[in-house]
Amino acid sequence: MKRQVKYALLAAALLPQISNAQELSADVRQKIGDLLDNVALKEISVGRVKIDSVAVEGKTLQLFANMNCAYIPFREDNVAEIYQGVAALLPAEFAKHDLQIWTNKRCIEDLIPQALRSKKDKKAKVFNPAVSKPLVTNVSAPYAPTNGLQDKHIALWQSHGWYYEQELSRWEWQRARIFQTVEDLYTQSYVLPFLVPMLENAGANVLMPRERDVNTAEIIVDNDGMLTGKSTYLEKTGDKPWLQGNGVGFAHLRNQYKGMENPFKEGTFRTVETIKKGHESKVEWTPEIPSDGRYAVYVSYQTLPNSADDALYTVYHKGGETQFKVNQQMGGGTWIYLGTFGFDAGKGSGKVVLSNRSAKAGKIITADAVKIGGGMGNIARGENDEISSYPRFCEGARYWLQWAGVPDSVYTVSKGKDDYGDDYKCRGIWVNYLAGGSSVNPEEEGLNIPVNLAFAFHSDAGTTLNDSIIGTLGIYQTDAYDGKFSNGASRYLSHDMTDLIQSNIVNDIRALYEPNWSRRGMWNRSYYEARVPRVPTMLLELLSHQNFADMRYGLDPRFRFTVSRAIYKGMLQFLASQYGTDYVVQPLPVDHMAVRMVGDNEVELTWQPVEDALEPTAKAEKYIVYTRIGNGDFDNGTLINGTSYRTAIPTGQVCSYKVTAVNKGGESFPSEILSVGRAFQSKGEVLVVNGFDRISAPADFVAPAPGDKEFAGFLDDQDHGVPYVQDISYIGQMREFRRAVPWMDDDASGFGDSYGDYETKVIAGNTFDYPSVHGAAILKAGYSFVSCSDETVESGPVALKDYPVVDLILGKECQTKMGRGGVTPLQYKTFTQPMQQAIADYCGQGGNIFVSGAFVGTDLWDNRLATPEEADKKFATEVLKYKWRVGQAAKMGKVKTVASPFPSLTGEYTYHHELNEDSYVVEAPDAIEPATKDAYTVMRYSESNLSAGVAYQGDYKTYIMGFPFEAVRTEAEREALMNAVLNFFKPEK
């Protein structure tokens, strides 16, 4: 289609438009609008598409549709369909006219993202800043992507945060507490555990204006001294001396900061000249770690005219040492994130070392403070200089940016008068500050980082009365800065990126979970976060956190993973189109894992890749095996070509392994963790089967009709759900279940209103690391052990009969829906038919099996999502010899052994019955009872005397517990319990 007249000229030709519009009847316009409506309704949920005006310029007919038309995701096929359909509706006098359909100041074919065009527009400028070296490079990584996001810098933030409200003189959330979360924390549950790692695994440097570490401890080690603790800063001089830098640096002079105080303007920094060979000069920052845990490591330095682009930092941690090269030609005077690592409590368990060795001699390396951990808020606000008393990761961007040394012109446009406005405004201004001085933003001063794109992750408000989905909205802005980026590229590139990301999100949700997921508009509107950044930017409103139908999906970690992967894919597509490269999507995590003994001191680990039905490029090419010995942490990994790995192990220690798949696009998320241990003078070998795969949203309900219009909600006390590793967005139980109660204020949010007693807490979930917990107790009892995933037993590679004892981990496994349910099959059944068959065969051959899980009975007898199967109950009663009595059997987390024919089974035990950061919660354990005369109750819940454990001895032995072994509170209790179980399984003499 020819485009002979630009939109600007058309706007000026208003009178010809009006007169010529009379040549196209209202009836034809209506039919064209209906056609466009039909195209739109295939994809989006918006208002009607209308033809607002018509113009005839020579032999060109131009139709101008309203903005609803611009919300259609235009592709070559539907654009051709539209033009063909509209042409057929035109009167005969227009048969030989060239036809153009305009919306959003563009012909519709120009709104097809460049990434999705079969023929590229070679004249269109792209946004592709060049970079010789990225900000941070992990040089210890065994594999680097070539067709991913390598060398790219992405500015990304999750919405809102805890802030100081001047009008009320209090700290508060920027949104309402609703459906067990608050937007200020909710979007973090996508960004931090899922989206950021995906982008980093693809090679990107991700820059954030909020604290990314949820650890509330923070250690500052600085050349200007430490405010507290015994951390040390040490310089070691080689061939080149350390000198005082000219200018200011960081100093930690106070516990809290008022007004516009800037810690990066209150201290000094150190400099040294680089060498290529000879004796290195080094700085060592040695922190005093308050407690065992994982901590983010940040470094700081100053950027000088002659700065090196390869400053070598080494982080010493529980898993070994990891090296990074930092390009100090950018990013000076703020906190630069290296990675997150495990450290032991105390001083000497870890350190950060900076060397002056470089590829080029005569450059300058600078050294300033190191920050370890996330910490608590330390920015004081209001007349009483009140700090938030919340973890820093809860706070809004405005406060992090002050702590990170960003100029006050960025984080407080209001000069300290309006923190709410400052918080949403500072994010976009911060993007420009990051890019200031680079080719991306050469007109402003800043950190010289060539930012490729910016992304604001929000959720929206709004409700529906019929449990339909509000859905996904994308926002961008094209008019700012005369509609162009600094290199002359059109700001309509933000439309391209918005379309790609929104399309990936909606298409993937529809394909995997909810065919009726709503795609809302793509708004070209002047939202501050979309307008201000001088880089391609999208503001995402993923769903409505106020709408129950949306949040039935939105609280599920599986949904969060899928959405985050879709966002990553959209960014990848967009950036590949800007650089003219082919992209490859990182693989999905591997499965079908097993580790077994081979020879006297070796083990073999095996696994299988997982195909991605939604992405043909996401194929595994190689793998990385990560190793953890004893109570250490995982190493930097070993690159493997095939699907197996053999290695020697030390005797008497638990050795653990996780695997990632890699390809040219990057690295997958990690697999579950399997463990193995060879005991000194081993009494035998135990197979640990990890059957706890579940991650899910909490239980929910809709009251039976006619009450379905009156009551609904989430039921934590029945089933809190299972977070992926940990949950950083949960605030407390829902307390308002009446649908009719409206939002009145953020302090009275109506239907869905929730408590806030957990909003500063990190809640433990499924770590996929339980074979090591079981294995440590097995090893202590004098037995060796190996482990495998449940699917290897179900599909056959691992034979239970090869092991005298089997320990099946079921955790909180139970049949679980996604969202409203009924669209996809239930997942996470405790005992699938193949598993039942494998166990029945094993028991028939005289095996010994230990099974523990919170829903071992409920899932087969009383799962409200599934119809009980007689075959399932028969398996439990006739093979494992137990039957279900009741769910939600206890609340106090205490069990005791009771008199039985089995004297080895003794002791009292406690398990995690409340939400905490160490173990997933067991809020609703099962009471189970003997199903045959040779089976006995051997444990009871202390508060009710309901049966908690059943043991059977006959031709084989079973020990079944209605609560999970790995949730037992202390190592000593677990060792005693496992020893009792294994003694029970000993053959009688």
List the model feature ranges, each with a label:
Residues 394-491, 495, 523-546:
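Active-site microenvironments of hydrolase-like enzyme catalytic domains
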